[in-house]
Each structure stands twice: as structure tokens, then as C-alpha cells.
């Protein structure tokens, strides 16, 4: 935004302050002299649009932020048909907090790391799936990537796995499908091949250190933005769904689907309902499993 000629900025936010970054986005837009639009997403709106998202996605996608992105696309399309988005910066320049553990993981990466949102262990999948296939393993998908990256440092391996699996298989899919459904064209300047070439040649020490992630990127941003914005701690594209889905006002549809005939074709319904009950009972870590199912 700071480097572009865009005159308008759009952002999604929530009433729950600890999940909301839209006020900081508004401050940044005001600082840059841009018109700012804020879309406040309610739990009712979130769950209501899920069928629309799944229909237009044309395949299952267990990414809770895809729903938020769809709402954002629809809101943005009300006043423009072309916009910029910042996808790619985290994967190219070391933006994810887990990248700080890269050196500690070392050579063990290839045995377990298949991306930044691995939801379930294989024994958990085996318990809930009626037709579990032990020959279809996520780590096998990542194996060729690790072969290509042989000899590179651990951070480079992690980021390349995320580029080829997460960025391509989730983020690009989400941007493409949801923008098209809303009649919006999204351009992602940070995924330009020239940007990737710079990032791929950059030593990892300029991407992540013990105190900071996305070091070089933030340092460059500080030339056009105040340091408190450029170096602000990353929250991520988070959704308050872990709170919403535990609320009986919003989770009745989830309960019905977990007991449906369709669910019974693929899952042990008692097993998945046990996961759901455990989540509602206070184990908030299970929310990703519930949403993915």
C-alpha cells in the first residue's frame, strides 16, 4: 500500500479486540492518506456464508480464514473491481513465527514438516476415518521438495515446503476462487518472479533471527512506515472461530452435520462427536480438527 498508487484500503475486523488488527490497519491507511473501509465480521455472517464459499471453492478447504477472505472480497467488490493483496511475503521472507525453530529442527524436518497447518496425526486420522489409507501420507507429498532442497539450510527447506504446498495449494486457490466469485480482480505484487528471485538468494539470517521474523522485509518497510508499524508483532490472518464454534448459538449446524448420513459415509460419527464435545468442553486446541472435519 505504501509503495503503490492505490487510493483506498480495505480491511476485515472483528468485535473481539484480541483478534482484531483492523484498527492498526486504519491508522496505517490514515498515515498514508488513503481512504479506509472496514468490514466488521460477525459470527452470524461468518457461518451463513460457508455454503457459498464451499460451492465456489469447488473442493474442500479446511482453512477457516477462507471464509473471512470471501467476505472481504465481497465487501471490497462493492466499490472497486481491482485490488492489491500482500500474499507471499511470509513464505518468501520468513514471516511465520515457527520459522524461528528451523535450526532446532535441523535434519529432522523431512520426517515431519509438511507445512504450517498440519491438523492431525496419522493415528488420529485412523481413529475417525472409515476408509483410512496408510499409503497416502502428507510427508510423502513433501518428500520431493526436500530432495530438491538437499544441502540448503533448515529455514530454506521450511519456506520452500510452504511455498509449494501452502501458498500454492491453499492461499492461491483461496484468492483465485473467492475473488472470481465476488467479481474482483486481485493482484499480488509480492509473488512476482523478480521478488521471489531476490528472496531465494537472500541468506536466511536476513529473514529470521532470535528476536524477529521477516527481518529484511520489515527493515525495508521501515523506510516508508513508522517503525512501530513495520516491526509490529505478527498476529496472522486469525479468526475468532475457536470462540464462536464453542458457542451453542452458532454450533448447532456443526452438531447436525457431525451426525448426518453424509458424515457417516466417511467418518466414525461417535469419534468425531467426541472430538467436538471435547472442544466445546474447553479444549480449544481441537477447534482446527472440528473445522477441518
Locate each region found by the language model:
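Acyl-group handling in specialized metabolite and lipid biosynthesis
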Residues: 10-16, 36-40, 62, 205, ...
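Adenosyl-5′-phosphate
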Residues: 65, 78, 82-84, 111-293
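Short, solvent-exposed loop/turn segments at secondary-structure junctions
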Residues: 15-17, 44, 89-91, 98-99, ...
Amino acid at each position: 500500500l505504501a509503495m503503490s498508487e492505490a487510493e483506498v484500503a480495505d480491511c476485515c475486523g472483528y468485535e473481539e479486540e484480541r483478534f482484531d488488527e483492523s484498527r492498526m490497519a486504519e491508522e496505517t491507511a490514515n498515515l498514508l492518506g488513503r481512504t479506509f473501509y472496514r468490514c466488521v465480521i460477525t459470527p452470524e455472517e461468518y457461518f451463513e456464508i460457508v455454503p457459498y464459499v464451499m460451492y465456489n471453492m469447488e473442493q474442500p478447504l479446511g482453512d477457516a480464514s477462507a471464509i473471512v477472505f470471501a467476505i472481504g472480497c465481497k465487501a471490497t467488490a462493492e466499490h472497486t473491481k481491482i485490488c492489491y493483496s500482500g500474499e507471499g511475503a511470509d513464505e518468501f521472507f520468513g514471516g511465520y513465527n515457527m520459522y524461528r525453530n528451523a535450526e532446532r529442527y535441523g535434519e529432522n524436518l523431512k520426517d515431519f514438516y509438511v507445512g504450517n497447518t498440519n491438523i492431525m496425526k496419522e493415528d488420529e486420522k485412523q481413529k475417525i476415518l472409515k476408509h483410512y489409507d496408510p499409503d497416502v501420507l502428507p510427508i510423502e507429498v513433501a518428500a520431493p521438495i526436500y530432495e530438491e532442497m538437499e544441502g540448503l539450510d533448515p529455514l530454506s527447506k521450511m519456506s520452500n515446503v510452504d511455498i509449494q504446498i501452502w501458498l500454492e495449494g491453499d492461499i492461491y486457490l483461496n484468492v483465485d476462487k473467492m475473488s472470481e466469485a465476488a467479481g474482483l480482480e486481485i493482484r499480488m505484487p509480492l509473488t512476482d518472479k523478480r521478488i521471489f528471485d531476490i528472496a531465494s538468494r537472500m541468506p536466511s539470517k536476513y529473514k529470521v533471527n532470535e528476536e524477529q521474523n521477516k527481518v529484511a522485509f520489515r527493515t525495508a518497510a521501515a523506510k516508508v512506515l513508522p517503525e512501530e508499524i513495520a516491526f509490529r508483532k505478527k498476529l496472522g490472518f486469525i479468526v475468532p472461530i475457536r470462540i464462536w464454534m464453542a458457542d451453542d448459538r452458532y454450533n448447532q449446524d456443526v452438531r447436525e452435520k457431525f451426525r448426518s448420513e453424509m458424515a457417516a459415509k466417511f467418518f466414525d460419527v461417535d469419534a468425531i462427536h467426541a472430538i467436538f464435545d471435547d472442544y466445546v468442553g474447553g479444549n480449544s486446541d481441537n477447534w482446527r480438527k472440528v473445522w477441518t472435519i
